[in-house]
Regions:
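Terminal low-complexity tails and localization/encapsulation signals of metabolic enzymes
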Residues: 1-15, 239, 243-246, 252, ...
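Short, well-structured beta-strand/strand-turn elements
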Residues: 39, 341-355, 416-421
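Glycine-rich beta-alpha junction loops
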Residues: 46, 131-133, 206-213, 218, ...
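A short glycine-threonine-serine/GTX helix/turn-capping micro-motif
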Residues: 167-177, 197, 201, 259-260, ...
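Aromatic-enriched alpha-helical interface/lid elements that frame and gate functional surfaces
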Residues: 252-256, 260-343, 347
């Protein structure tokens, strides 16, 4: 972790204020901290709710919070207090970037809209995260991954069927992708400021990110889709009225919008079950599919005259897929991985979380890092999203305790110990002891 000089990281000297909780924007803060930014996480006196979420390991810290808040300083204050507003004003005056994911109604309540804070610092870059976008009936509400998965259509194409109902996609893919998009947004705005001297507001949303994640499946073309979509909508409505399961509904929908698609005929881009384990195959091009068939000694029925809309041809394709499954089930996964890769077919292991730490491809590239937590000791977690040759990217510390750096930060703003002690006594700020 300390093999490089922290001062040489690309965002060294950049100050970021993070008013955010749970996943999406805190993960953005992690990316910026890994790149060297001085990220100050501003929490309420009770702390980010993620502190008390899944995997509690300390009274005020969960495993999830630890992994989503490494490399940050932490202060805790009562946003509603007048004295806190003065603290925030001083923070903003010295900051470069604000990451804001408070509900839009709270921004107005606490005077933290972009128009408010830019009066204190016109060069500030203000990331406003409105989970569903600012407009519309959901615009003022807090956002959750499960809601946007459903609203965006992402779950309809990716979710599993659990007892007839769609299962939520986990981990929270929209949250994590939004964190990356948010980091891209503020760094792009930082570049604009370098060129022009101007700050600005930038925006991200979970809903927009979800639409992007589903982008190769959710689209509409006037030349081909209106009639198909009308037929699919009618069939889906009937299936829902009849109480069919989610999987049945999706199969009906897919049969109309993507004839011949679906798991029954997916031969080349999927996970297979070998004698011992699962493994992956990714053969999308004609050349790769030919190699796949050569390895297994099979012939794809589509190499001859074939019509997917013909029931007999469709059944032949289903039988072909089952044939491949039966052959593969006869040997162990490693045999097939080595054989496919030797013949140029993309293939790899299917790992559960505990196996990731022993995966050579991951360890050889330092994609997993070992960090030190002041109370928990050593732990392993994901590495930075990017690497740079001239300006190394790496985390420099673990997550902060609730209010761990409150006194340190306030002293840097010009507060003296007597003032800080008074604010602590009035329960306006919190300092970890």
């Amino acid at each position: 972790m300390n093999e490089h000089n922290p001062a040489h990281r690309p965002l060294s000297g950049t100050t970021v204020l993070e008013f955010a909780s749970i996943l999406a924007i805190p993960s953005c803060g992690v990316h910026l901290a890994d790149m060297g930014a001085d990220v100050i996480k501003v929490e309420p006196l009770t702390g980010d709710p993620h502190r008390y979420g899944v995997g509690p390991v300390l009274p005020d810290e969960s495993k999830g919070f630890t992994t989503m808040n490494r490399g940050k300083k932490g202060i805790a204050l009562d946003l509603a207090a007048l004295e806190s507003r003065q603290i925030i004003k001083r923070l903003v005056e010295q900051a470069d970037i604000i990451l804001m994911s408070l509900k839009l109604s709270d921004l107005t309540k606490f005077g933290l809209e972009y128009e408010d804070v830019k009066k204190w610092n016109e060069r500030i870059i203000f990331l406003e995260h409105a989970p569903y976008g600012r407009g519309g009936p959901y615009g003022q509400e807090g956002g959750y991954d499960v809601v946007v998965q459903g609203m965006s259509g992402l779950a309809s194409v990716m979710a599993r069927d659990i007892n007839g109902t769609p299962g939520v996609l986990t981990p929270a893919v929209a949250d994590m992708a939004t964190g990356l998009a948010s980091a891209l947004a503020v760094i792009t705005a930082l570049r604009h400021r370098d060129l022009t001297g101007e700050g600005q507001k930038v925006s991200t949303s979970l809903l927009q990110t979800s639409l992007i994640l589903a982008g190769n499946r959710i689209h509409w073309f006037a030349a081909t889709d209106p009639e198909v979509w009308n037929s699919a909508a009618e069939a889906l409505s009937e299936a829902q009225h009849d109480g069919k399961s989610f999987e049945q509904q999706r199969d009906i929908y897919t049969a109309i919008t993507n004839p011949g698609g679906g798991p029954a005929t997916n031969t080349y881009f999927r996970y297979y079950r070998a004698t011992d384990q699962f493994f992956s195959v990714g053969a999308l091009s004609h050349n790769l599919r030919t190699k796949f068939c050569s390895v297994l000694g099979v012939t794809d029925p589509r190499t001859n005259e074939f019509n997917m809309s013909n029931p007999d041809d469709y059944d032949r394709l289903v039988s072909f897929t089952r044939q491949c499954e039966d052959i593969i089930r006869g040997k162990v996964a490693q045999h097939w991985i080595e054989l496919f890769r030797k013949n140029g077919v993309p293939s790899g292991p299917f790992n559960f979380p505990h196996q990731v730490f022993d995966e050579q491809q991951i360890s050889d590239n330092n994609f997993i890092l070992e960090l030190e937590h002041k109370m928990l000791g050593k732990y392993k977690t994901y590495g930075p999203a990017i690497q740079m040759e001239k300006t190394p990217v790496f985390p420099n510390s673990s997550s902060p305790s609730l209010g761990e750096h409150t006194r340190e930060v306030l002293v840097s703003l010009g507060y003296v110990d007597e003032e800080i002690d008074h604010l602590i006594k009035k329960n306006i700020i919190r300092q970890y002891e």
